[in-house]
Amino acid sequence: MVNKKQQILRINKLIIFLLIFSFCGGGSETSETVEEAQDTTTTTEAQDTTTTTEAQDTTTTTEAQDTTTTTEAQDTSTFVSWANVKGPPMIYAASDVSQSTIDKTLKWYEIASSAWGEFGPAEIWIVGNSKETVSDLEDLWCDIRTEKDKKWNKEWDCANEYWSPFARYVDDGGAAVSTYYRDYIDYHFFLVTMGPKYPSPDEDDYKVVTMHEYFHIYQHAHISNIDDEGPSSAIRDEKMGGADKPWFAEGGAEYMAQLLYSRQPNVRSNYLKEIMDRKAYSIGEYLDYGKPLKDLTYSDPVQTYDIGTWLVAYIVDKVGEETFRVNFYKDLDGLGFEESFKKHFGMGSDQLISEFDEWIKQPVDELLKIIP
């Protein structure tokens, strides 16, 4: 059994190694050529992640300036996002997470950020398979949070008997993005949590999931309303397609991630059609269920992610990738969800979904004709 101090030290060594790696890495792995300009902030300041050293069971942090530059053309006409810090993310991993998993996570995160623009600050926390190492990761989380933000509430926002930021990922795997853009803290950031149990880092799905989560960062970075657990939060939810309504946010993240992955070197040419064919199995249950797509929640017994992915594929086929990813999100904050939807997709969301619901009744072979 490795004692607590040794485990934290192992975590810290991974952080230091990865920080060095992130400076040496970059977008050279990215093969996608996107015709449209990228919708990013114009801020040139880039603050990198922290290196961590152990001292009496606490962590100390020193900042290093990142000199990485993005070679892709950037859209300088977008509003100045709150998430305007460029540079590689901070990565923290449990001591039982392999270096290859850390490297793979960073690689596919950077492929996505190179294609869609850099937004941050962001932190990636990779959970392992052991409750013991997760406990140490939770301790590190609290140390980092309280060091970066004096307003951080240790009693409620560090791991306790009622809540943990990472524990469920040990058994369930998965991934998520949390937006810490809140009125009761001073340091605002994105939290990307990766649970490598499902999908495994050895699977192609892990690469896609990493990019899927980055697209959620892209989405949230285009919304200026702060989370105040009140009116501003409600507006923020509305701009994501509705509170607890995954149809647009998840559909967009999934389709854009799958599309980007399909363009990478050595990915089979029919990959995207195969994925969308698989997702088409959910169409029948959606049509039979009878509940409007916009009203489906995460708890409904319908694969809303799959239907949302097909909806976004349908939108992209109608108006183009640039209109969906760049123009819609550029106007989202100022116009609101529905008005930006009408402006760029030619009709309101209810009308477009009604049209889509008729379209997906066709044989799957016909549907797949819109997939590149």
Spans of model-derived segments:
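N-terminal secretory signal peptides that target proteins for export/translocation
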Residues: M1-L9
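C-terminal motif of bacterial Sec signal peptides marking the signal peptidase cleavage site
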Residues: S22-F23
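Extracellular mucin-like PTS domains
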Residues: T33, D39-E72
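Beta/coil-rich, acidic/histidine-enriched accessory regions frequently appended to metallopeptidases
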Residues: T76, D103, K107, D333-P372
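Acidic/histidine-rich, surface-exposed loop or edge segments in extracytoplasmic proteins
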Residues: V80-Q99, M194
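Zn2+-dependent metallopeptidase catalytic core
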Residues: A93-S178, K207, M211-Y214, A221, ...
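Active-site-proximal alpha-helical
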Residues: A112, G252, M256-L260, K273-D350, ...
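Zinc-dependent metallopeptidase catalytic helix centered on the HExxH motif
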Residues: Y169-I275
